[in-house]
């Protein structure tokens, strides 16, 4: 074996070692424990950054934008009921897998809550202990149900019922909309209340009193005493 052949073999071996990863799944842990927020210290790639062919998905500056949510951002949302671009709960990340490189580096496979950005980000050296490019996120905070909402309630038009408070969990979806797929006189009970950490708005979990009507989360702005809904045969909320 001449020195050129030997050198080529060593180069190939080095590349193979560099690209070696162990794929693992985190799907056996509760979804809420796998919600994270970017730190802005590392970019997002299509593969672990050290793997050949890894392409940039979101730069460090973009990840930093996802990471930041100030009181000014919350005030903007409060006045307009929408977030600035790349802001809000939709830009938390959900971890659904990871890869370990030969050096012991963890790269988490993540996706934004709205599904728009997906890829791998460096996450430290210990599986499940989020570091590097991500840190653990608490997307909602528990809050109390107001005393005057202990009786039956209804939803003003065009209130929407969600499976989660919007984008506080991955795969958020609409379950129905009042006066479209949900009757305007549908009756509910409030059983839980949370506040979204970023937007600071409150969502009530409404338990449907009829099997044909879905239970789910509704923005408090659209939840009214049932007597108000019933007396007006449904209320339109502008």
What are these regions (language model features)?
Residues 14, 49-51, 100, 115-117, ...:
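Generic "edge-of-domain/loop-turn" microfeature
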Residues 111-148, 207-238:
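Boundary regions of SH3-family modules and the immediately adjacent low-complexity/disordered segments
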Residues 1-27:
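Sec-dependent N-terminal signal peptides of Gram-positive bacterial secreted proteins and lipoproteins
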Residues 26-102, 130-203, 231-238:
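Beta-loop motif signature
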Residues 8-9, 14, 32-35, 46, ...:
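Homeobox/homeodomain signature
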């Amino acid at each position: 074996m001449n020195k050129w052949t030997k050198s080529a073999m060593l180069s190939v071996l080095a590349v193979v070692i560099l690209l070696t990863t162990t794929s693992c799944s985190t799907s056996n842990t509760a979804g809420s424990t796998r919600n994270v927020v970017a730190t802005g210290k590392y970019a997002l790639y299509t593969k672990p950054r050290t793997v050949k062919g890894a392409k940039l998905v979101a730069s460090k500056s973009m990840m930093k934008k996802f990471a930041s949510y100030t009181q000014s951002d919350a005030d903007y949302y409060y006045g307009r009921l929408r977030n600035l671009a790349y802001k809000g709960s939709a830009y938390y990340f959900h971890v659904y897998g990871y890869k370990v490189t030969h050096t012991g580096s963890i790269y988490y496979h993540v996706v934004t809550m709205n599904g728009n950005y997906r890829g791998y980000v460096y996450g430290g050296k210990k599986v499940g202990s989020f570091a590097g490019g991500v840190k653990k996120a608490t997307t909602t905070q528990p809050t109390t149900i107001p005393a005057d909402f202990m009786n039956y309630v209804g939803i003003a038009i065009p209130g929407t019922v969600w499976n989660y408070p919007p984008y506080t969990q991955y795969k958020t979806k609409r379950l129905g909309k009042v006066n479209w797929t949900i009757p305007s006189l549908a009756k509910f009970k409030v059983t839980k209340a949370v506040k979204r950490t970023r937007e600071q708005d409150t969502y009530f979990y409404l338990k449907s009193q009829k099997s044909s009507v879905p239970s789910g989360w509704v923005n408090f702005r659209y939840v009214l005493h049932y007597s108000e809904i019933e007396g007006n045969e449904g209320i339109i909320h502008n």
